[in-house]
């Protein structure tokens, strides 16, 4: 057991980590273009935050959270999603008192006790974007645009954007009555989880993926027919912005998301190539969450995107992430005196901005050059007694085999030029 990672977790080795770095760097770059700033929140929070923020009727709270009492008897939960901690930080540090909106993003591990499967682990990593303080549908459109821009820049084109409005507490109350009356006639066709949802939060039945439940909800009344004027106008405004940006979308009444805090906009971006776990991004508006968590009455909207699932989607689409380049220079050496000189020279060149590799395995000169090839080094030099005396080396271009004699002090300039 000591040599095996816990079930539902995965090591990211150097052969894969470059893909993560590429994707995460692109996420940060795009967010900066849109004016979003990074936030980092703790890996665990007080359990009450998720009970109030995510909702006690959700699968996350009922089945999936990692919750324990610490040594002081406080109930603590490992971060189960990214929005509630961001809201907590927004309130705790008084960011609501600053000029609005507040635009944040995060890349963070989250923990859920789920059945491990492709693209879904018990520890997975989430990219999220939140914008607090903006009630306009243009904010909803902006976060959708960030997600679509990222996916398209990664080369994903076989996507569906599905949108819905889940209304506000006022119009949703009316719809819940109608929906509950409809579901009452089909209770025996619902799965066990949805029978519980029927009692606690019937809207969540629409989100169920069980086929028997989907057959029932396919005939259910549409929430969009029960929206109040404010929610309907907001949804129409969102569609105008999406149309203006040229995004195709499908209005899907089943999109309600798995969290209780959503109001008005709910959306998902689905890859047609990843199978059962096709949603690569999901989000929406949560105009009551900040107040529910103890802050002022302020709106918010955002999304979450699983990085593991995104990488799986890229793989299934045959999209290859560029591998990092090899070192700028490999310095081979002959003898102990040359090794010491090589070691200090490599450090100096690294400090000045070059990627430099040397041998630590006491290989022969021939083996060192073979190792340089394996590392895909751009240039190589050999330093021995003769080179130490003359202060000159032959700089070898590893791609062409061409050699140029230069002073050791000119190595940096020669490579950079």
From Swiss-Prot:
It comes from the Bacteria. It is an enzyme of class 6 (ligase). Its main location: cytoplasm. Coiled coil: none annotated. One of its GO terms (molecular function) is histidine-tRNA ligase activity. Its EC number is 6.1.1.21. Homodimer. Keywords: Aminoacyl-tRNA synthetase, ATP-binding, Cytoplasm, Ligase, Nucleotide-binding, Protein biosynthesis. GO terms for biological process: histidyl-tRNA aminoacylation. Pfam families: HGTP_anticodon, tRNA-synt_His. GO terms for cellular component: cytoplasm. It catalyses: tRNA(His) + L-histidine + ATP = L-histidyl-tRNA(His) + AMP + diphosphate + H(+). It is found in: Cytoplasm. Belongs to the class-II aminoacyl-tRNA synthetase family. This is Histidine--tRNA ligase.
